[in-house]
């Protein structure tokens, strides 16, 4: 244990190496802001798209952002949830999505070799641009969310968080 402490002591006073990121920014023709960091160290890329579509936008329909976001990868024309998952997996790609208070996001991590990248981007484009919202998935996910809401009613931490936001922001989303 003294060696561990000695090795940590060696770090005292040393500044960590700081890698400068070259962040390029631009706006698309549609007005979306793009932040881009190029790194050739790994043969892969990460892409995240953020939307101002979090739960604060739900209004009188609590859970709308969560439900909509959860349904994105449940189906596209010609593919069900299993085929979508297998498509990403077969390409070595990872699709993820989530909805939070102030935003919703979708992300893709894929190999950058053209054959893998292009196929992963095509599937990603279908998932976020052409979701079919299948009825069976809608019923299943809706039940999961309702069960989650019931659990939250019994969770002191969640109840405290709700009360805090209510006191801080009132009726403001």
Regions found by a protein language model. Give the residues of each.
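Generic detector of short, locally flexible boundary/turn motifs and exposed helical patches
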Residues: 1-3, 10-16, 69-76, 171-173
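General structural signal for secondary-structure boundaries
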Residues: 7, 80-81, 135
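M16 family metallopeptidases and their MPP-like homologs
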Residues: 37, 41-73, 79-129, 142-150, ...
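Peptidyl-prolyl cis-trans isomerase
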Residues: 130-133, 138
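Proteolytic maturation boundary segments
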Residues: 1-48
């Amino acid at each position: 244990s003294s060696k561990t402490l000695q090795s940590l002591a060696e770090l005292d006073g040393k500044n960590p190496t700081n890698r400068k990121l070259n962040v390029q920014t631009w706006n698309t023709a549609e007005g979306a802001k793009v932040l881009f960091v190029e790194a050739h160290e790994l043969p892969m890329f990460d892409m995240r798209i953020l939307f101002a579509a979090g739960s604060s936008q739900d209004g009188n329909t609590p859970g709308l952002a969560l439900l909509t976001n959860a349904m994105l990868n449940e189906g596209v024309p010609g593919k069900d949830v299993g085929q979508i998952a297998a498509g990403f997996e077969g390409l070595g790609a990872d699709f993820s999505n989530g909805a939070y208070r102030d935003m919703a996001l979708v992300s893709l991590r894929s190999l950058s070799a053209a054959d893998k990248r292009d196929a992963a981007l095509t599937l990603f484009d279908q998932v976020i641009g052409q979701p079919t919202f299948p009825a069976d998935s809608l019923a299943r996910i809706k039940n999961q969310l309702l069960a989650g809401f019931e659990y939250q009613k019994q969770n002191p931490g969640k109840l405290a968080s709700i009360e805090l936001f209510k006191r801080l922001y009132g009726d403001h989303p």
